Amino acid sequence: MKYLKKADKTAESNVLEAQKVVHDMLSTIDKNGEQAVRDYAEKLDGWTGDILLSASEIDEITADVPQDVKDDIDFACQQVYTFAKAQRDSIEEFHTKNNGVEAGQRLLPVNVAGCYVPTGRYAHIASAYMSIATAKAAGVPCIIACSTPYKGKSIHPYVLYAMKTAGADHVMTLGGVQAIASMAYGLFTGKKADIIVGPGNKFVAEAKRTLFGEVGIDVFAGPSEVAVIADEDADPDVVAIDLVGQMEHGHESPGWLFTTSDGPANTSIPTSPKRVLLASATNLLPGPTIISAFLPVNKP
């Protein structure tokens, strides 16, 4: 087996550095409140505009979203909402009484849900309706959505339209740790989130992990991983899309491409991000064997 390309490994020191950065930021925001958030928004994202967007501002920003894009987002929002509502309706409340012991199950939505939608490197439109529409279907009375300023401006128009369509009650132009802290501490809206959901980089993930206990979270997510095995008949576009679909989650999300020849590799690599480790083997081992060799933590 030979390597056609190798990606650098992530140093453990990077994780420790992220923990320290997040700890310091959360402490500063907890102490100085909204002003600290504004300072971080300007320092990290170059944003000095309104944090909490009004309905008229949202309408203005989304006015030029192409109709075909609106139609696609409308369709996606409805699909997610319909499924989530059916899922919610399939879970029933019940009450039992046995030998003097009463027990049961009640379904109560949280009061406030915070939905984080990253747009730092890519505009994750799907993250908007997957979180907000689901919360809406669950019956959450107040939904707060946050997204990073996009290219020095307010929230990406497509993402903002998705937030609006999915049913966000409050929208804040905030990204990163300052967004997570603002939702957890109830800054700008006066509503403290009971749960915070949504993907993000290592700083966002660390902020959610640190605040867990004060606020509920969906999951502490690490970097995504993907491994693709392709022979000479594989469609290079499909291979590239499968790789990018996971690696877009962050520049520390590794991707592996194993091929039986150089052909698929040479065609797929140019359309994939730089952080891809690629191995070409003359005789391809069985899939689970070769994957386990590189991903021992995921062994069956």
Each language-model region and where it sits:
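N-terminal Rossmann-like NAD(P)+-binding subdomain of aldehyde/semialdehyde dehydrogenases
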Residues: 1-111
